[in-house]
Amino acid sequence: MATATLTIDLDAIAANWRALDQMTASDCQTGAVVKADAYGLGAAKVAHALARAGARRFFVAACEEGAEVRRALGSGPQICVFSGHMEGDTALIRDFDLTPMLNSIEQLTRHFETLGGQPFGLQLDSGMNRLGLEPGEWEAVAATALEAGPELLMSHLACADEPDHPMNTEQLRAFRAMTDGTGVPRSLSATGGILLGPAWHFELTRPGIGLYGGRPFEEARPVVHLSLPVVQVREVEIGEPVGYSNSWTAEHTSTIATVAAGYADGLPRTLSSRASLFAGRVPCPLVGRVSMDLITVDVSHLPEVPDALDILCRHQTPDDLADTAGTIGYEILTSLGRRYQRRYGALAA
């Protein structure tokens, strides 16, 4: 079989949610971010696992994602949409009982005119300059918006993965200035904000990457294992090239395994001749270019070539691979290709 196997540990995701939930006070609700197909791991199955663990409020990027999660979970849990109420979203918000996080005066107007009485939340810009009402805009519409009864006031931290960054305190101060005294539940923190401490928690947190085993939640249980099948093995003599552009040449007689995965499957080309795959605990260097469907790996030092090599495992996390590729673990996870056979179960010890 030439299809790689991506194993996803739903119990580990649930355990990570519970661990993050325990970091906050009992009167602080812990939500769950399942946008981008639950960071590439399957929103329907992940949302089910998180709901069983106790999550009651889910966050997605767009209404179409919210509809998928609602189909999976049925009625009950609240599903909040970060992009708010865009033009064309009205039917989805109504039919799938979604809660848009309105982030502009235009969206406020659209929502009140088309879905008056439908639950909504508000995003406020505390300094990231990405989404949300700016302080001046909020001051102008706060009385009207609060009278309509928002479910949540939220903002987002720009530098939460850097605990000592002054922006964290600046945004906390700005958020409090906009929301103190409103009497509405508030949310400022995703995973990084949870780790900053109780001052950033308010009434609701929204962990995302920490659920899926990523930094900055260093104590997270690993969630994914990606095993790539070996398609062919050949002996390469001294001076012979491997792969596109002859970018790697054998300096000694080498055993090269051609493995079924490439940039079409989410492996960045920047891994070319830089990354390692693993045979058990033994690292094996990737040699030559990452191509669309294939990579080549030097397995000369192995006593026997296995049927598959691991690229995500206990010895190389998504963050580790991201460091090698010059990116972040979020990108590695969300780029995991559709060709992988997804298997849900416990990871091998």
From Swiss-Prot:
| Pfam families assigned | Ala_racemase_C, Ala_racemase_N
Where substrate binds, per the record, is at R130, M292
PTM annotation (N6-(pyridoxal phosphate)lysine): residues = K35
- Which biological processes are named by the entry's GO terms? D-alanine biosynthetic process
Quote the pathway field. Answer: Amino-acid biosynthesis; D-alanine biosynthesis; D-alanine from L-alanine: step 1/1
Question: Which leading EC class covers this enzyme?
Answer: isomerase
Q: Which SUPFAM superfamilies match?
A: Alanine racemase C-terminal domain-like, PLP-binding barrel
Q: What are the alphabetically sorted keywords of the record?
A: Isomerase, Pyridoxal phosphate
InterPro entries, alphabetized: Ala_racemase, Ala_racemase/Decarboxylase_C, Ala_racemase_C, Ala_racemase_N, Ala_racemase_pyridoxalP-BS, PLP-binding_barrel
Which EC number(s) does the record attach to this protein?
5.1.1.1
Signal peptide (from-to): none
Q: Which reaction is recorded as catalysed by this protein?
A: L-alanine = D-alanine
Which Gene3D superfamilies does the entry mention?
Alanine racemase, Lyase, Ornithine Decarboxylase, Chain A, domain 1
Concerning PANTHER family, the annotation shows:
ALANINE RACEMASE (PTHR30511), ALANINE RACEMASE, CATABOLIC-RELATED (PTHR30511:SF0)
Q: Which NCBIfam families match?
A: alr
Explain the purpose of this protein: Catalyzes the interconversion of L-alanine and D-alanine. May also act on other amino acids.
The protein's name in its UniProt record: Alanine racemase
| Record organism | Cereibacter sphaeroides (strain ATCC 17025 / ATH 2.4.3)
- What broad taxonomic lineage does this protein's source fall under? Bacteria, Pseudomonadati, Pseudomonadota, Alphaproteobacteria, Rhodobacterales
